[in-house]
Every structure is written in structure tokens, then in C-alpha cells.
């Protein structure tokens, strides 16, 4: 029996649609596999280019634990990829920013002296604004898939990262005390001032613009102003003095009763930890909640020491790795950063007996004590422009 023409046409069209659907699925799958193959081939080329390169990594050099960790990473990179890692120890990464600005001004767009920088905040914003960074590159790293995307990795002190820097770890400003000598440490900056007045010469903080010192005064300003909304906006000459007035009033009082009368300050977290261990200070400061464990393991702190955050929480941020636009070892830099994001490298970095730096990977990819690193309630950083303004004013008032 002959079917109606329109019915035959409908069956014919259904076959065509079905066939096209299968073809589209096959084509889509082929595209995915082709993209993956291209991506793999591209990364293989980068690894081949990286072999034999020397990577100059500009990073803070004020921690024995961090320095030893980078020595381990250097051995792994040499053995596994043929990449030589040179840790260029800097006191303040702003020195590296100045170097890169000079190279930019001189038209040195290749064969630069810096291959990787460890940065965040104001230094990232400065490098980004002056087009000093290579990228975006982060999502092309094979180990990017392990990164915990629930972390605020797409912003750095409110500045969009736009793939120009890869997250490396999580920082939180906390204090360390010895439970045997100070059972109930101050839980706020208000209590800290009262403690210093009751027990003069026992408290201090690193001298700004050292990172920990600047973080101390930012955290103090947030508490004193009840986290004034102006701090989340670019700093303004119109409101700077008004917003920061409580900060300088507090520090004027604090310095009078601080260690050495506020005339001298620890150079950084390492010295504050040493002064705590020597019994000269009752509190040390760190941006790593777990550094107390590695310091205990290396004999730098007593087993009775403990890290804690103030009652309101801890100033918190992500720290990042970036590649300058003119890096001489660009391929080697990408391979290095990719390795530092591997579960192996992040697990070792997070090991409480090695560095204890909280990882940026999802915990399911971590092993050992890195899976259980301690984190406190977080307080957001102010807008990065406040950092430079606060440091300048601090130096003007107390720098001599």
C-alpha cells in the first residue's frame, strides 16, 4: 500500500535529521579530541623548548623554610625537565617591578633578566597597568585542572587577574604566642594596645614597607574603622587623612610602649619569630597560619607555641606567580609554574613540617598533612592603592 506523499516526506526528513545528528556528534567529538591533541602537542613543544633553560625566579628570600622548598623544587625541575631554577632572593618584590619598568623604558622586549615573579596586590596591579606581564597563560597549564576554582583566584586585591598570574598559595595574617608565657593573647588590636601599655617593650611589628608590617597596619586600619567602605575603593586624597586618622592616633600610643620604644622594628617575620623564641617579644607575626609547625620542626620555635587569628578574623589573600613579558626563559617559566601547581609540589609545600603554605588545589588532589592545613575566618584586603599610600605616610611619620 502506498503511503501518503507527506508521510513519506516526513520519514525521509527524519532520516536526514537523524543522520545529520550523528554526523554532528562525530564531528563535535572529533573537534574535542583534535583540540586536546593540539593542546598536548603545544605543551610538549613548550617542554622541549624549556629543556636546558635557566629560570630566574624573583621571590622573597626571608624564610628558611621557603628557601629550602625552592631548592627541592629546583632539583625536581632539573631532573624531570632539564630546567635550572635560580632563586633570586629579594626583600621587597617592588625592587623587581622597578627593574622591569627600567627594561621596558629601555626597549628591552626580549632576553629580560626576570623569568618568574612571586607577587600579589599592589605589585601585580603596577605590573599589569604597565603591560609588564606575559599572558594570559594560566588556563593552558596542564595542572590548571587541579586548582580549586572556588577560591578567589580571578581577583588579586580586587584587581582582575585575567590569566596573567597563576595562584600559588593562600596567605592569612596571624600571630604566634608561647602558651607557657602568654596563655590568653590579645584578641583584638584594642586589647593589644592595652597589653602593650600594661607590659611595655613586649610587642612590635615589622617595619613597613616590609610586607608583614604593611599587612599589620592594614589589618589595624580595618578594625579601627570598622572596615570603612572607602577601603574597598581606590584611595583618594580627599578622604585619606580622615579615614586613617584613627590609625596614626593608635600607633602614636602603641609605639611609646612597643619594643625598643617604637624606635626600632623587626626586619620581617623571621626576626619577629626569632625575638619571640629569644623571649624578647610575646607575639610574632606571620602570613602563614601553619608556619609555626615548620618552625617547630626546624627547632626555631618551642613546641608550646601556637598560631592564632584575632577575634574578627585574619587579613587574607592569594599569592601568585607571573611571567614578565620579556622573560628570557618563557617556556622554562611556564614549565616551572606548571610543576609548582602539581599535586606533588603543592602537597610538599603544604606539608606542616616543610612550609605549611595552604594549597590552591582542591583537597582531593593533596596528600599528607597538606590536606588539613589550618585556615581562619578571612578578612578581605583593601583596594591595592591603599598599600602604597599607607607605606608612604608611615615612613613620613615614623621612618626616621
Which functions belong to the PLM regions below?
Residues 36-42, 274, 373-400:
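Conserved C-terminal helix/tail region of periplasmic/extracytoplasmic solute-binding proteins
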Residues 124-126, 283-302:
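A ligand-binding cleft/hinge motif common to bilobed small-molecule-binding domains
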Residues 10-20:
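Bacterial N-terminal signal peptides that target proteins for export
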Residues 42-51, 58, 63-84, 175:
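Short, polar/charged alpha-helical segment
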Residues 100, 127, 272-277, 323:
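Hydrophobic residues within well-ordered alpha-helices
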Residues 60-72, 88-97, 110, 114-270:
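Extracytoplasmic ligand-binding site segments that recognize negatively charged/polar headgroups
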Residues 314-381:
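Mature extracytoplasmic/periplasmic domains
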